[in-house]
């Protein structure tokens, strides 16, 4: 099949991780519940940060953008899953699949880069506190976030363009929850060696470079914390960084479960890793920040109950 013409008029079948009607009903309610919790949690984080002047700091500016990214990420994948669970027609167009893939790649990359910027923010706050205000100026924060968005958009466009060079033939059944690069390469009948090599090379750069930066930042942060004379100050500083460290561990852990394996051994039935990567991480991020960050403990609750409070 010609990659430029016939692919554009073809469809894929998103069969999900189970074809049993009973299991699909269970999965529908499970994913719907997780989606609603994710949306509510991340929207509350965004509203709490935007409405509380005490949270108008670089750390929470990046956290609000991380929540927006997670919100957009689950909205890109889960609604289509829910429709497929309830419908006999599980088709998704070629263009629709590429669109979903583009946003998937871009948003995961954006998550990754924002986490790296947040690590830099924590490094400056912990290791160079006297220079924090000037080092993390509003202009620099906007510039860093703009760079994150720009690189994410370009990386998403690059991988999506590479996939348009692939030829598909035979059954186009995707036993997966959404259109994923690895799954689509698995279905290809043309030679994907060059594309797979490019995918690994660019993926290592775009993901391992920020991971190395975050690791270096936290080594220096831990070293600085250990040199603090006061135990209470050590605990307070570590608690501030612990929430971000927890999110980073969850993000890279689930990402590794899905993608750190050769293409020919890639399991299309790897449902546990898929659910953790696609749903659990965005859902857990707001809870991690609320539990581990003192400033965020009551902020979402205040936003939630504000409409029911009587004016004084």
From Swiss-Prot:
Keyword set includes Transmembrane helix: yes
Residue ranges, Cytoplasmic side: 50-57, 121-140, 221-237, 292-312
Keywords: Cell membrane, Disulfide bond, G-protein coupled receptor, Glycoprotein, Membrane, Olfaction, Receptor, Sensory transduction, Transducer, Transmembrane, Transmembrane helix
Record membrane topology: Multi-pass membrane protein
Stored PROSITE patterns: G_PROTEIN_RECEP_F1_2
GO terms, molecular function: G protein-coupled receptor activity; olfactory receptor activity
Disulfide bridge partners, by residue number: 97-189
Compartments where found: Cell membrane
Glycosylation: residue positions: 5
UniProt cross-references to Pfam families, sorted A to Z: 7tm_4 (PF13853)
Superkingdom, taxonomy of origin: Eukaryota
BP terms from Gene Ontology: G protein-coupled receptor signaling pathway; sensory perception of smell; signal transduction
Topological domain spans for side Extracellular: 1-25, 80-100, 159-196, 261-271
InterPro entries: GPCR_Rhodpsn, GPCR_Rhodpsn_7TM, Olfact_rcpt
Transmembrane parts of this sequence: 26-49, 58-79, 101-120, 141-158, 197-220, 238-260, 272-291
GO CC terms: plasma membrane
Function: Odorant receptor.
The family this protein is said to belong to: Belongs to the G-protein coupled receptor 1 family.
Designated name of the protein: Olfactory receptor 1D5
Species whose genome carries this gene: Homo sapiens (Human)
């Amino acid at each position: 099949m010609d990659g430029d013409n016939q692919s554009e008029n073809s469809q894929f079948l998103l069969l999900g991780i189970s074809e049993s009607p009973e299991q699909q009903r269970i999965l529908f309610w499970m994913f719907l519940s997780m989606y609603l919790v994710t949306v509510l949690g991340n929207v509350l984080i965004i509203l709490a940060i935007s409405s509380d002047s005490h949270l108008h700091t670089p750390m929470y500016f990046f956290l609000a953008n991380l929540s927006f990214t997670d919100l957009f990420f689950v909205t890109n994948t889960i609604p289509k899953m829910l429709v497929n669970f309830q419908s006999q027609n599980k088709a998704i167009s070629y263009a629709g699949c590429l669109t979903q893939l583009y946003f998937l790649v871009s948003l995961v990359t954006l998550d990754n880069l924002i986490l790296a910027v947040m690590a830099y923010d924590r490094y400056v706050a912990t290791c160079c506190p006297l220079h924090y205000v000037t080092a993390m100026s509003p202009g620099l924060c906007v510039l860093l976030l703009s760079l994150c968005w720009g690189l994410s958009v370009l990386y998403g466009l690059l991988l999506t363009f590479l996939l348009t060079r692939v030829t598909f033939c035979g059954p186009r059944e995707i036993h997966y929850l959404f259109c994923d690069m690895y799954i689509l390469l698995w279905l290809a009948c043309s030679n994907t060696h060059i594309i797979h090599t490019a995918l690994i090379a660019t993926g290592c750069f775009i993901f391992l470079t920020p991971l190395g930066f975050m690791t270096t930042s936290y080594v220096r942060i831990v070293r600085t914390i250990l040199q603090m004379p006061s135990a209470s100050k050590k605990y307070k500083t570590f608690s501030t960084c612990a929430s971000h460290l927890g999110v980073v561990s969850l993000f890279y852990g689930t990402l590794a479960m899905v993608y750190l394996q050769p293409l020919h051994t890639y399991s299309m039935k790897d449902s546990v890793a898929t659910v953790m990567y696609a749903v659990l991480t965005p859902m857990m991020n707001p809870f991690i920040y609320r539990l581990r960050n003192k400033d965020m403990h009551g902020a979402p609750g205040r936003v939630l109950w504000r409409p029911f409070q009587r004016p004084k």
